[in-house]
Amino acid sequence: MKRFRKNNLSLQQKTTAFVLCLLLLLSTFCTAQIGKRFPSERKVVKDPITGTELIFLTSTPAGDSKIYPTHAQWTADGEWIIFRSNRARNEALAVNEKTGDMVQVTEGGYTGMLCIAQKSMKLYFMRYATGDTSQRRRGGPLEVIEVDLQRVLADSKTGKMKPASTYQRICGTIPEALGAGGDMALDAEEDVVYFRVGKTEADKHIAPGTKIEGAFGPRNMGAGPAGLMQMNTQTGALKYIVSVPFQIGHVQSNPWVSGEIVFCWETGGKSPQRTWTVKSDGTGLRPLYPEADYEWVTHEAVITKDEVAFAIMGHRKIAGADTTGTAVGGANPGQETAWGPSGTREKPTGLAIVNLRTRQMTITGQTPTGSGLWHVHGSPDGRFAVGDDFSRSLYLIDRQTREMRLLTTGHKATAADHPHPTFSTDGKKIQIQSAMLSADGRSMNICIVPVPEDWLKRGSEK
């Protein structure tokens, strides 16, 4: 009986196998490397309906998507937009608005929101702490990472990149037991980040006797409790903020006022009370806009130092449910009867703006027909508001005169996601994600929609 099996691989075969493995490793490293550059795809396309000149910063089908409107889109210098793309899967890219040059600005993956600092050239995000990037899935402790964008972009331009650790710093680690999600926001002072924690931790801090909410609506979401915590970006120190009896979503900070947080009761649709605000020390918890049962409030976003925009939806038939409804990603979502008697035009609907100080709310505008405005935003100077609708059209509103103008359309209701309009900090342009150039009607690109010059001049004359 043979005790040993002879190795029949020749030296040449072993060498070939080694070389192939080495090439595979090098290929993986190169494709995932921070600072990697991609050629410009920038092109200007004239909207055939409105005549607006659209600036597509990406124009090929590579699975692009923008950051959500609750967060900043541009870097602090106003020159780059951070976005997600399958060009570097599970990594963040920056595109230069003027040249169209693209640069990978993270390495090692991320989860949840990308938080762009507005006082410094920094980017913050979460990632799973395991060193094995192939194992970075749900579960395990999370790290908060800071990226030095200034150094990444400068070294990438000269072709003299250093190891990723040169540009990426671990701010701190969030233990797995906290059940944290990637729903994170950066404070205006950039010294802390806020994030959501899970039911187990939230239950430890909730006031005795608090009624814990169950799921609400047909998507079986919204059950509590949940909580908010913060991490100091310099020391990694963790501090608990508040617990609430419902599911938390859309955590965002006020970019102009330190310590002010806005979040929502997340149900995937209509909520019993959608919008909430709290201070970072846990005080001042209250509904931001106390809503009625018949109001479908959604997609809140801080737009000025004192104001939050949101949509009061008017997408449902007054007589009852519309049987032509689609899933949330389709062209006519939110029609199920389980959402209750909300979202019709029997009551006032439209793009609403509430003042955080006075608590007064005004409706700035609404489309006369169709779904009504859906994802909304506003210019930081208070001059303009913007919203999309189910058809993926984009409407601009003059907040002084209430005049509304169709800016662009044709972005395809079959798109993989919604336009999600977001104003630049100077109030002169709007970023969206668009499937206008997509052959399959789904893949999206990063697009800039300028505010018309005549409207900009009109505003400056007042």
Give, region by region, the residue ranges found by the protein language model.
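Blade-terminus and WD-like Trp-Asp/Gly-His loop motifs, strongest in beta-propeller folds
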Residues: 71-80, 85, 114-122, 126-129, ...
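Blade/loop signatures of beta-propeller domains
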Residues: 33-55, 220-226
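Blade-level signature of beta-propeller repeat domains, shared across WD40, Kelch, NHL, RCC1
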Residues: 418-462
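Asp-box/WD-like beta-propeller blade repeats and closely related beta-sheet repeat scaffolds
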Residues: 109-226, 242-243
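Beta-strand C-termini and the immediately following turn/loop, strongest in propeller blades
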Residues: 82-88, 124-138, 146-149, 194-200, ...
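Loop/turn-rich, solvent-exposed surfaces of beta-rich toroidal or solenoidal domains
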Residues: 311-352, 358-403
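Multi-bladed beta-propeller domains
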Residues: 45-65, 94-110, 150-179, 230-247, ...
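Blade-loop segments of beta-propeller domains
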Residues: 68-71, 88-132
